[in-house]
Amino acid sequence: MKIFHLCWTLVSLFSLLVAADDINLESKVVDTEDAAKIIQASTSSHTNNWAVLVSTSRFWFNYRHMANTLSLYRTVKRMGIPDSQIILMLADDIACNPRNAFPGTVFNNMDQAIDLYGDDIEVDYRGYEVTVENFIRLLTDRWDENHPRSKRLLTDENSNIFVYLTGHGGNEFLKFQDAEEIGAYDLAHAFQQMYSKKRYNEIFFMIDTCQANTMYEKIYSPNILSVGSSRIDESSYSHHSDMDVGVAVIDRFTYYTLDFLEKVEKNSNVTMDKLFAEYTYENVHSNPGIRTDLFHRDVNEVLLTDFFGNVQEVILDDVENGVLETISSVPQSSKASDNATHYEALMATYSDGGYKTKQLHHVTKKEAKIITAVSAVALGLLWTFAKP
């Protein structure tokens, strides 16, 4: 019987040696600071996302421009940007227009599958509030103290901003409601003021209008990626009409933008170059342009969610201190900084009161294998030598 016990002990000891051989003795623990650097090296360094969506047209025959804007509004909301961080500027004269055969609705497709206007929209500037002055004041935050916070672009140096314009334009200008124009230099200077006032980390500027590319040619501020629907002396075209509505319901450039984005989820790793690949002449019927010289990252490294989505909070386990620390936090509301302050005060209270945090050790599969083998050896030895 003792021979059997001895054999059992030897087998257990062999299992212990095999398990020990699998262990990498040179394994290295990466601390939280290094982990944060690894994460930030491959992603944008922004901490919050905003969207400015503007339809500069009015009147019934410009139905498609409002549909363009509401379509992108629906997309960025689906991707995670909250209404509190979306500024929507519309003439808002389509849904309740007496010519509308479907009162209170706006569609972007002839199948009328989605009512863009009925999806709990929040219009920040409507009707005659959609002016060049208000648009520039919005970008530069030049308001008096009584201006509502809900109608301000409350960005900072860590903000990624998606700016979308659609309407009627020409060579280096875009019309606002057939009453005034914003020029390419006006837009460029507004972006420069934003940069000087540290109001953005990166900007993605998209414009869908005739001769759209001329509107981004004068921009000179860094970290701005631009795309337009047509080059100089080219028109931008609508995609199709709805015979029941009686007018065109969406433009070609925005249609193919949405067609691609509808396949993208909020946690997707799809990059911007994949979207740009959709802007072919066969699709758009014009020559879209992309300006990347002011942008510091390659478009094949820029995630669509860097601008169309909302960055999420990442929490890493500090192995050394045993404390959960927020490495990259994107506030979902104005209470985020208050929560951080409360957390610091709470930790200070624990420290002053003599409390100590104990590191929780998570057993790996290899460690579990070793523990099992050691236990088996111990039991085998006890079984072998404990009996007379």
Task: Show the residue positions of the predicted features.
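Classical eukaryotic N-terminal signal peptides for Sec-dependent ER targeting/secretion
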Residues: M1-V11
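Cysteine endopeptidase catalytic domains of the caspase/legumain-like
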Residues: L16-P388
